[in-house]
Amino acid sequence: GKPICGETCFKGKCYTPGCTCSYPICKKD
């Protein structure tokens, strides 16, 4: 399925593919 973006950004990075940092939470691109 599609990645779920909701983890906390770590140093401006998101480890889930297809997600970007919208501090402090990762959002879908």
Curated annotation (Swiss-Prot):
Post-translational modification: This is a cyclic peptide.
GO biological process, any: defense response
Superkingdom of source: Eukaryota
Disulfide bonds: C5-C19, C9-C21, C14-C26
Family classification: Belongs to the cyclotide family. Moebuis subfamily.
Function noted in UniProt: Probably participates in a plant defense mechanism (Potential). Binds to and induces leakage in phospholipd membranes, particularly ones containing 1-palmitoyl-2-oleophosphatidylethanolamine (POPE). In vitro, displays cytotoxicity against cultured cells. Not active against Gram-negative bacterium E.coli ATCC 25922 or Gram-positive bacterium S.aureus ATCC 25923 up to a concentration of 64 uM.
Free-text note regarding domains: The presence of a 'disulfide through disulfide knot' structurally defines this protein as a knottin.
Protein name according to UniProt: Cyclotide mela-3
Biological source species: Melicytus latifolius (Norfolk Island mahoe)
